[in-house]
């Protein structure tokens, strides 16, 4: 089986776009982890990129199972992402909220886990 068997061409859904943003965020925060000179921020970014992969996978598999759709890749251009990590978190939280009501309760629970992790990360990033 090939990746193309799971993807389709055409317009991505809001969930595809959300999934793409989360996948981009994984690399984004890993990069910030290496770039920072602050130990507190280093540990906060470590928390994000340690927790996020399983949450991305869980959301993606749940959504694809629920919708019966094939995944349409929609990863945002890195040059269009905020350079400030708090603004990036806020963007993810906004997109989480925008798809929340469209999802069944089980997937809403996963989105709750994702948003909870990012709210905790905002707190961790506020520490010195």
From Swiss-Prot:
InterPro entries tied to this protein:
DUF5856
Source superkingdom: Viruses
A Pfam family this chain is assigned to: DUF5856
Name of protein: Uncharacterized 14.6 kDa protein in mobD-ri intergenic region
Give the species: Enterobacteria phage T4
The gene name on file is y05O
């Amino acid at each position: 089986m090939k990746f193309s068997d799971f993807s389709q061409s055409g317009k991505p859904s809001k969930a595809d776009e959300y999934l793409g943003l989360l996948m981009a965020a994984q690399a984004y925060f890993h990069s910030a982890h290496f770039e920072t000179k602050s130990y507190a921020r280093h540990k906060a970014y470590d928390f994000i990129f340690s927790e996020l992969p399983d949450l991305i996978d869980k959301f993606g598999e749940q959504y694809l199972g629920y919708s019966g759709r094939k995944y349409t890749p929609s990863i945002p251009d890195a040059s269009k992402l905020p350079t400030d990590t708090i603004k990036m978190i806020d963007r993810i939280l906004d997109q989480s909220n925008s798809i929340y009501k469209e999802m069944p309760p089980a997937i809403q629970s996963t989105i709750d886990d994702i948003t909870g992790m990012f709210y905790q990360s905002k707190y961790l990033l506020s520490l010195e």
